[in-house]
Amino acid sequence: GQVVVHRDSPLQQLSDLDRHSLAYQEGGQFSTNLLILRTLREQKIDFLPRFLDTESSALRSAFLRKYDAALVNNYLMRLVPPQVTSQLRVIHSGPALPPPAFIARRRIPPVVVQKFRDALLAIRDDQPALLESLLMTDLVDADLDRDYGIMARHLGGGDRR
């Protein structure tokens, strides 16, 4: 995740958010928000939260200077037109996180899960442009420790299951 401000903003770093507004999607991008909000709390930065319905609204609020900063996901920034991103500046980037995982409920028969997995891997192998249009760099089998251990490390360890 990233904390962005309007390019003309006087805010230069995360600590400058003290007593300034930070817009973000309430409940959205859970892991991204969680880690950056934890950093703000650990650094005792007393920001003014502004909860919005969408992440795009948060970004728009920084662009239009309605709020001082916005907390957004890195993927969103790749979807925004250059004429918007050129008016924004990143003042903080959180740790790199794994992309979202596809997870199947236990009640779904394993044969159906395997067919879905095979179809996704076929897209990866046969239609790489389709993956790129979805902002996916690759599809791989998820590994709990490799892919999600970062959350446990940042949140103080413990059982991740």
What is each PLM-predicted segment?
Residues 1-2, 31, 83-154:
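Periplasmic-binding protein-like
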Residues 7-9, 27, 75-76, 96, ...:
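Solvent-exposed coil/turn segments that connect beta secondary-structure elements
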Residues 61-64, 68-88:
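A ligand-binding cleft/hinge motif common to bilobed small-molecule-binding domains
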